[in-house]
Amino acid sequence: MTFYNYLMRHRAPVEKDDATRLANLVFQDPLFPKQSKDFDEISTYLETQAPFYFNLTLFDNIWESYLEA
């Protein structure tokens, strides 16, 4: 499962946590690397190219949950 697929399991109309917030933001971003399973690629994208700001420490926590899923 890609990180994008994992995030899409957390999408919701009302933000209930950080994963939901990131999922909703990524869903609206057509350039997000949807096929990636690579931490560095996604982290770099969020840091340098994403059209939104998201705290990378929170991303690290969500990534750890992704790895455990």
From Swiss-Prot:
InterPro entries: UPF0346, YozE_SAM-like, YozE_SAM-like_sf
Pfam families: YozE_SAM_like (PF06855)
Signal peptide positions on this chain: none
Coiled coil location: none
Family in the record: Belongs to the UPF0346 family.
Protein name, per record: UPF0346 protein YuiB
Protein's gene: yuiB
